[in-house]
A protein has these predicted regions:
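Sequence-structural signature of mature extracellular/luminal beta-sheet repeat domains
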Residues: 1-215
C-alpha cells in the first residue's frame, strides 16, 4: 500500500477522527483520556483533557465538538481492548468540547434515570439532534447492555430508541437521512433502522428487542 502515509505515531488507541477546516484532524485517544490535534505535517498536540475514555467525536451544528465518553477502561498488557472498566470508572457520558479552548462540558450522564454505560459513536441529523450508541461494559462474568439513543446538543433532551442491544458500535445515517445504520461488533451484524422523523424510529414488533433489520 504505497499510497498510505503515516502522519503520527504513539497515539493511545486513536478513534473518532474529525477533519477540520484548517486541514488538521482532531481525534480521541481512549487510552490517554484526551483528545489531540494532528496537523497536516504530523505534529501532535493536546486539544482537550476530557478524562475518562473519549471515543466517538463529531462536529455539531454550532461548531462545537461532541464527544461520546465511555468512562474509561482497564488495559492489560497483551490486550488491545479494554478489560473491564477503569478503577475510577463511574459512568459514561456525552460531552461538548469548546472548539477554541478545548474545555469539556458535561451534557448527559444518565437516561431514564439510569447511568450511561459506555457511549461509543454519534451522528447528527439535519434537524440538529444526534443519534448515539452505548456499547455497554464487559465485566469478568457479566456485562452491561448497550443501547441506541437520541439527544439534543443543548443538553435539554435524551431518549432511548433501542434497548437492550449486544454491542452497538459505529453508527451512521444514509444520505437521505431515512435509514440509521448501527454496527453490532460482537454480534457480527449491521443493523438498519427506518427513521420516521428526528429521533423517531419505526416501532418494533411485539417481543422484538428493537425494530432494526439485519443488512
Amino acid at each position: 500500500m504505497d499510497d498510505v502515509t503515516i502522519l503520527a505515531t504513539g497515539l493511545g488507541f486513536p478513534e473518532g477522527p474529525v477533519a477540520c477546516p484548517d486541514g488538521s484532524v482532531v481525534l480521541t485517544e481512549i487510552r490517554h483520556a484526551r483528545c489531540s490535534r494532528v496537523t497536516p505535517d504530523g505534529r501532535v498536540s493536546a486539544f482537550s483533557d476530557c478524562g475518562g475514555g473519549p471515543n466517538g467525536l463529531a462536529i455539531g451544528p454550532d461548531g462545537g465538538f461532541y464527544l461520546c465518553n465511555n468512562g474509561g477502561s482497564r488495559y492489560v498488557g497483551g490486550h488491545s481492548m479494554g478489560m473491564g472498566p477503569h478503577p475510577d470508572y463511574r459512568h459514561g457520558s456525552i460531552q461538548r468540547i469548546d472548539p477554541k479552548t478545548g474545555e469539556a462540558t458535561l451534557l448527559y450522564s444518565h437516561v431514564d434515570g439510569q447511568p450511561l454505560s459506555a457511549p461509543n459513536d454519534l451522528v447528527f441529523d439535519t434537524a440538529g439532534g444526534f443519534y448515539f450508541t452505548d456499547l455497554g461494559k464487559r465485566y469478568a462474568r457479566h456485562r452491561d447492555h448497550g443501547g441506541l439513543y437520541y439527544a439534543q446538543p443543548d443538553g435539554s433532551s435524551i431518549v432511548t430508541l433501542a434497548y437492550p442491544m449486544l454491542s452497538p458500535n459505529g453508527c451512521g445515517l444514509s444520505p437521505d437521512g431515512r435509514t440509521l445504520y448501527v454496527a453490532d461488533t460482537e454480534g457480527a451484524r449491521l443493523w438498519a433502522f427506518e427513521v420516521q422523523g428526528p429521533g423517531r424510529l419505526k416501532p418494533k414488533l411485539e417481543f422484538a428487542p428493537h425494530s432494526g433489520r439485519v443488512v
